[in-house]
């Protein structure tokens, strides 16, 4: 039903997969002249122009996935996304600024030097150029559906890679299939990125425990094929999910072994990954804090704050 259309990005992950069916486009890619020109060529090869696209479906609000939505919206396309994604995409610079403020303080409390915390949280400012704000016309969540080329696509919520993640499920050539964004990838393990609190003063989401639960539920839905946001199709979704969960369990146990005395999240990150460059420290902290959250949820560690430092220690 959907045709995969790889779109170039300026990011380390490489090309992002857009998906095209009739006049509907899923995840058009980042807002760059290179991506726009490439996508126009791909559409022209199918006797289409940007003005012909009537509907954009967005799996999650990361710049490499939704950035070009604004150009299509300006040409009359409707934009469909989860309400949480819609809120982020409506003011991406403002969302990023709030994230920077939260994580600058949080990373210092995790044991990061103030100068490093500044550098880590300032890096995403470069993303703003590729993600102009866009208004969402249709807001959907689990249980809703959208029509594409005469077919009903069911929406389900996902957790773990970004706020406001959703999948679009449909009956395809191999059976039950779904476009899943970056929640499950064929060749690389998705990053369980840290997320700020949903509102000021609230607790931050514990992303990795929720991601593990979401993956287990998705595995039990018994899909036959996933269409991911990067690289090739996932031909054995339950098996791939099991592999990801096994990787998570192995890393969680590595973290547990390291907590025989009080450790900060930064010390855990250093133990896991060594001397990471600044560009890799946000995903590194996401991994370290995520596995500490898993251990905390299982009552295997105690957590306390001393002298403005968060410390974890194994209870076993």
Located regions from the model:
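Short alpha-helical segments that sit at the start of domains
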Residues: 11, 230, 235-258
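Hydrophobic "anchor" residues on beta-strands that sit immediately upstream
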Residues: 23-25, 56, 78, 177-178, ...
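Conserved beta-strand hairpin/beta-sheet module of binuclear metal-dependent hydrolase folds
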Residues: 1-46, 168-187
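Divalent metal-coordination and catalytic microenvironments
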Residues: 21, 27, 60, 72, ...
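Active-site HxH/HxHxD metal-binding segment of metal-dependent hydrolases
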Residues: 31-37, 41-145
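Well-ordered beta-strand scaffold positions
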Residues: 23-24, 84, 144, 151
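C-terminal regulatory/interaction regions
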Residues: 254-316
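Metallo-beta-lactamase
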Residues: 31-32, 150-240
């Amino acid at each position: 039903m959907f045709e995969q259309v790889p779109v170039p990005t300026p990011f380390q992950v490489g090309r992002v997969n857009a998906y095209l069916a009739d006049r509907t486009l899923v995840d058009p890619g980042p807002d760059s002249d290179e991506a726009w020109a490439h996508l126009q060529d791909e559409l022209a090869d199918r006797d289409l122009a940007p003005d012909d696209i009537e509907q954009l479906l967005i799996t999650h609000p990361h710049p490499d996935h939704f950035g070009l939505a604004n150009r299509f919206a300006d040409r009359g396309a409707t934009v469909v996304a989860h309400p949480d994604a819609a809120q982020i995409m409506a003011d991406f610079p403002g969302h990023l600024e709030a994230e920077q403020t939260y994580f600058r303080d949080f990373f210092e409390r995790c044991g990061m030097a103030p100068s490093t915390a500044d550098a880590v949280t300032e890096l995403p400012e470069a993303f703003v150029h590729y993600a102009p704000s866009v208004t969402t016309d249709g807001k959907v969540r689990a249980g809703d559906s959208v029509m594409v080329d005469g077919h009903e696509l069911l929406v389900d919520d996902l957790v773990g890679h970004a706020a406001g993640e959703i999948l679009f499920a449909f009956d395809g050539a191999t059976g039950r299939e779904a476009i899943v964004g970056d929640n499950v990838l064929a060749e690389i393990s998705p990053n369980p990125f840290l997320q700020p609190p949903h509102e000021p003063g609230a607790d931050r989401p514990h992303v990795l425990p929720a991601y593990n639960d979401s993956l287990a539920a998705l595995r039990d839905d018994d899909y036959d094929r996933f269409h991911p946001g990067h690289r090739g199709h996932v031909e054995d979704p339950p098996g791939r999910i099991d592999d990801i969960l096994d990787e998570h369990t192995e890393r969680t146990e590595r973290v547990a072994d390291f907590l025989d005395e009080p450790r900060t999240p930064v010390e855990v990150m250093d133990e896991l990954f060594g001397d990471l460059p600044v560009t890799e420290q946000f995903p590194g902290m996401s991994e370290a804090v995520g596995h500490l959250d898993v251990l905390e949820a299982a009552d295997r560690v105690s957590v306390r704050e001393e002298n403005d430092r968060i410390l974890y220690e194994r209870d076993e």
